[in-house]
Amino acid sequence: MEHHAAFDYIRDLLTLPEVVETRHHMHHSIPKHDHLTRSVRMSYHLSRLLHADIRTCVRAALLHDINSRAGTLTTHGRVAARWAAAQGEDPAVCAAIESHMYPLGPAPASREAWVLVLADKAASLGDIKQFLTGLIDGRSLEERRRLKETDPYYRQRSQRRFRRWRAKYVP
């Protein structure tokens, strides 16, 4: 990962097992870690532009999708916020995380929360661009196959599908 000024604010978080393992989790057909680091960079720039607290914004950006599969599309912000609180994160970071899915979740109540909402949406567009660009040379499909093998969620889902298929078609 190249150095970016934003990473000075999150250095202590980058070695947490839950953050490290995002390199093996699929998110928008790319590694979740790519989405999170893209969100961090976007949050850094937006927080400077909108005069929000940089530290709060980039820390929330890195943690906003941690344990996202423990919730649903509308509740995973609350799940990630609770996890961040359990790690000792500032309440402002947790509040921003909880509302990052607006308008599907609660409305942001601070400038920092709005920064995360915008950064997450912008990062998601970057994720889609990364995936589509990779389709041209085959990198995206290769990466998606690798993630399906290393991501515990998709590995279990594939095993369930295979068992159902085998039960249906193999005597």
Predicted regions and their residues:
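Metal-dependent phosphohydrolase cores
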Residues: 1-171
